[in-house]
Amino acid sequence: MSRNILFISVQTIKDRTGLHNNVDDKLINPEILTAQDMYILPALGTGLYERLQTGIQDQDLTNDEATLLDTYITPCLVYFVMSELPMGLSYQFYNKGMIRKTGEGQENPSASDMIDVADRYKSRAEFYKQRLVKYLKEKSGTNIFPLYNLSLIHI
């Protein structure tokens, strides 16, 4: 269940990628939440996912949870968000329908170009997701992330 608690900030994405600072945060935040729900939740399992959300909200993450979030989840999520952004930033809905944003004096990428960019970032994200899952599996024999171990039973 999504509680609108983001694992990363818009600024984190801007700091780690080529995303320009003038991109409106309101256009990025929904993509963060969507990427968390679509890609991170299945990797973590519901129990661990919700525990991290609660830990962020209550500011009581353990050191192991903070390491998981900072070292493994953040890079994965950054690139999943970047893989979702090309279409989300180029096409927007207004009261007259969907339009494609264009800028004067600029060459607009084709839909094929945007798909190529999205695929590039998704490839990076999949690398980091595999690393995240490997880390969690390595720790599954310990009691560091018991909620992850419980979620494995229900998969």
Language model features with spans:
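Conserved short "hinge" loops at termini or chain/domain junctions
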Residues: M1-T74, G88-K96, R100-I153
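Catalytic-loop motifs flanking and including active-site residues across diverse enzymes
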Residues: L77
